[in-house]
Amino acid sequence: MAIKLINIGFGNIVNANRIISIVSPESAPIKRIIQEARDRNMLVDATYGRRTRAVIITDSDHVILSAVQPETVAQRLTTKDDESDE
């Protein structure tokens, strides 16, 4: 299985094979997940001080904050999948 990388904004790249979900940060359960990840030192803030627009949860229980919309990240992920099928 080839490693697929996805840009999550500002030159930050994540292994697409490790992503479980991409969600919006507004709901209380997601805010709780972010706080728990911060407490466990499993939070990666890739927003460069900008507003968090997407929360990426990985299979290693890392939580990654991104300033890019969840739809944009999902589109980049889908585009990468389509390119690998060719």
Swiss-Prot record:
Instruction: Output the superkingdom of the source species.
Output: Bacteria
Q: Which Pfam families match?
A: RemA-like (PF04025)
Spell out the HAMAP family in the cross-references: RemA (MF_01503)
Instruction: Write out the similarity annotation.
Output: Belongs to the RemA family.
Q: What is this protein called?
A: Putative regulatory protein BBR47_37350
Organism of origin is Brevibacillus brevis (strain 47 / JCM 6285 / NBRC 100599)
